Amino acid sequence: MCLLRQEGKEDGILGKSILRMIIDLPKNVENIIERLKEHGFEGFAVGGCVRDSLLKKTPKDWDITTDALPVDMKKIFKKTFDTGIAHGTVTVLMDGVGYELTTYRIDGNYSDGRHPDSVSFSKSLSEDLCRRDFTINAMAYSNKKGIVDLFDGRKDLQNGIIRAVGDAKKRFD
């Protein structure tokens, strides 16, 4: 189970967890998030691209997390290919660049240490962020909402700390 550092808020997406800050999203990432929104879904840049942007580094790639299911993503975007449908991942091609879109999910056990044995799709960004490995990779961003940082990843980044989301022993055992 993932415990959020938010007193009295199980969802944790309100209050201090959202930091108003601007990350310069590539135009295609903005377009993907906007198209998701136009179709009634959320979309956030997530993980290493948010971390790298906060470090003033150019991200190697941009991952997007959403409450849209793969079937929805394939209807919304013209050029897609299945990257990991069982894990909720579809790659959207724009201007020759691939952007991985993954449905919010809750992961089961990891018998190979890398890929979950099972996944359950979710409608909750906070549940999706709970499955991430480290606090510095468990941050999400959209121009509208700002940075969603439920586990103090930004603080850990500033202090040079690598900390697991949840119980490190259980996560990496």
Q: Where do the model's predicted regions map?
A:
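Catalytic cores of the polymerase beta-like nucleotidyltransferase superfamily
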Residues: 2-4, 10-173
